[in-house]
Amino acid sequence: MNDRHAEKIRRAYNVAYWGNDYFYINDLGHICVRPNPEVSQSSIDLAELLKEKEGKNPQPLPALFFFPQILQHRLHAINKAFKSARDSFGYQGDYCLVYPIKVNQHRRVIESLLKSGESLGLEAGSKAEMVAVLAYAGGTRSLIVCNGYKDREYIRLALMGEKLGYKVYLVIEKMSEIKMVLEEAKRLNVVPRLGVRARLASEGSGKWQASGGEKSKFGLSATQVLQLVEILKSADCLSGLQLLHFHLGSQLSNIHDIATGVRESARFYVELHKLGVKISCFDVGGGLGVDYEGTRSQSDCSVNYGLKEYANNVIWGIGEICNENHLPHPTVISESGRALTAHHTVLISNVIGVERNEFSPPQAPEKHSPRALESLWYTWQEMQKPDHRHSLRECLHDSQRDLQDVHTQYTHGILDLKQRAWAEQLYLQICHHIQKELDPSDRAHRTMIDNLQERMADKLYVNFSLFQSLPDAWGINQLFPILPLEGLNQRPERRAVLLDITCDSDGIIEHYVDGDGVANTLPIPPYDAENPPILGFFMVGAYQEILGNMHNLFGDTAVVEVSLDEQEKISVKIDNPGNTVSDMLKYVKLDPKALLAYFAQKIKKTDLNAQLQMAFLEEFEASLYGYTYLEHD
């Protein structure tokens, strides 16, 4: 296969863009992972990794493959981008990346980040998260940001952290919070370190735009900011207000929105200084997006900028306002959780069932068949003629109308089941023929191509729960890159839609990455229906594990940690074997031991022989302590 042909095939999956150097397709057509692309080009072939485990200790699927070195490299890359921006623009303030643990609170994630040796603060958005952050914060003077709704217990935990020597910023997001903070600080005899979240007029666009702007759930209006300043003055605590925070929304796709928001928030910085508030930290919140679809555009699941441009806009925007007003450069904080974690995990699962169209030469209808059947057959015959006068669009419309007539006549008892089946199969033959004749480069054909691809797509039933593993794909139509682990050096001749194994019609992935951006079907290479491909779901490291739910009692998948050691040998260890049926039953207060006892009682009341009773009981018990997903016998 020549290089041009290989590159054309690779473009069908856009890996070069969404992969961000962490993922690529090798010459064998396998998807590979580079855990630390800046240091080494050594990679891990996911297909070969699975095959190797199959020979030694087979890994049950689905499983989440966790790459701690990618996580650590993301931390390094973000810090590096901001250092470069500060150097370029002569910015005098520091920078601190803060990890909002709500993005993924799992221990393996927090510990991997803290072990990296890079500068990192932590953010809590709830009482439970505050407990975790206090326990995990690094040495004294570690930076902690406290967001979200706060009760007195949450506030006391934060103030305890301040007493322990951490730099803990209690961000005031509701006016009702300040009274509690001042009262609890007095009880603990500690000077609180405060922040204020300003509610901006600026907002981002996309799926999360409601989390920023004037309609935001959190933040103080301009009037409330002034009221807060007066309250702190009266309490002689104005010096404690040290941090200004804003948030435009998650996954900001347009760099212009970011620049606009930074400039508006910088005006708050200036005005607060005029009021005597010596703000020293400027928290730009989240919003640093990742390119899930690889189009480098302003669409909801993409971004039209990179790390460097984002850092440049933030640092230059704040620095410029400070210089204009002769104010000190504050420490810049960003809460870039999605950009930090999205790439570091890959969900891998097997296809457990395939439904696809197979075509054989059609047979003519019986003589004197109803008109709708004869009309369908006429369309098919006309299309076989090299000089047929009907356009492809006309043939498609004619066959669609005839099929509709067939369904109507079947409903009224005019046609029987065999006639309906014959008509539906011939209609698919017509669609298949038209699909092969259409030209993807012809814009007039584009809509027909998309519609036919969706109509003719294979259905792949995948061993996973959409609601557990990709909840954002279900809830907000979030896009995730998906592709087979191998066969990617072959032309993707087929299209597929992926369905999960829950008993829910919503358990279907509706949008996929392809070379043209976003499609309703997944391009896949030829495959044996008896041996369908293993699939990888990429960039699922942010939010998905935490948001996943227990629909149909499908539990957490197994988690496998994969890294390259100093000799660049692959190290694999099981971080979590995944939930068993017993685990999930306990979540809903069903006692597995009691269920086993109930089942045993039912068996004893039957007339089954002792051997069969024992076999049934053993099977039931094995199911109780087995994986919640489908397993190979």
Swiss-Prot record:
One of its GO terms (biological process) is putrescine biosynthetic process from arginine. Its EC number is 4.1.1.19. Substrate binds at residues 282-292. The modification N6-(pyridoxal phosphate)lysine is found at residue 102. Keywords: Decarboxylase, Lyase, Magnesium, Metal-binding, Polyamine biosynthesis, Putrescine biosynthesis, Pyridoxal phosphate, Spermidine biosynthesis. Pathway: Amine and polyamine biosynthesis; agmatine biosynthesis; agmatine from L-arginine: step 1/1. InterPro entries: Ala_racemase/Decarboxylase_C, Arg_decarb_HB, Arg_decarbox_C, Arg_decrbxlase, De-COase2_CS, De-COase2_N, De-COase2_pyr-phos_BS, Orn/DAP/Arg_de-COase. Its cofactor is Mg(2+); pyridoxal 5'-phosphate. Transmembrane segments: none annotated. SUPFAM superfamilies: Alanine racemase C-terminal domain-like (SSF50621), PLP-binding barrel (SSF51419). It comes from the Bacteria. GO terms for molecular function: arginine decarboxylase activity; metal ion binding. It catalyses: L-arginine + H(+) = agmatine + CO2. NCBIfam families: PRK05354.1, speA. Belongs to the Orn/Lys/Arg decarboxylase class-II family. SpeA subfamily. Catalyzes the biosynthesis of agmatine from arginine. PANTHER family: ARGININE DECARBOXYLASE (PTHR43295), BIOSYNTHETIC ARGININE DECARBOXYLASE (PTHR43295:SF9). This is Biosynthetic arginine decarboxylase. The gene is speA.
